[in-house]
Design a protein with these regions (language model features):
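Positively charged, small/polar-rich N-terminal and surface patches that mediate targeting and assembly
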Residues: 1-100
Length: 100
């Protein structure tokens, strides 16, 4: 069984709802979230600070999950967040584990 890493780039307005979905998802083995700056993407109207800086405030979420759960996890996210500006990409998890 291979693991994948789903990276989500979400606007601040949907951050809590996305994190809640992942907390309740049996498909999300472990995930992290961190504030980040998004370049080249528009999450609706930039505020004045974002216009001056040339970047939008966002949250990056990375989720480790089994490749067999990919379709179900993405379908659930797409169902709840269609049209919100949430972006994603999936990469292979070459190796993951806990340092014991």
């Amino acid at each position: 069984m291979s693991e994948l890493c789903l990276t989500l780039l979400c606007p601040p307005a949907i951050e809590e709802k996305l994190l809640d979905l992942l907390l309740l998802s049996p498909n999300a083995t472990v995930f992290t979230s961190t504030p980040t700056a998004a370049h080249g993407l528009a999450f609706g109207s930039f505020n004045q600070t974002e216009q001056v800086l040339g970047r939008a405030f966002a949250t990056q979420v990375q989720v480790i999950f089994s490749d067999t759960d990919k379709a179900a996890l993405l379908a659930r996210i797409q169902q709840q967040f269609a049209g919100t500006g949430l972006r994603y990409w999936v990469t292979p998890g070459v190796e993951a584990g806990e340092i014991a």
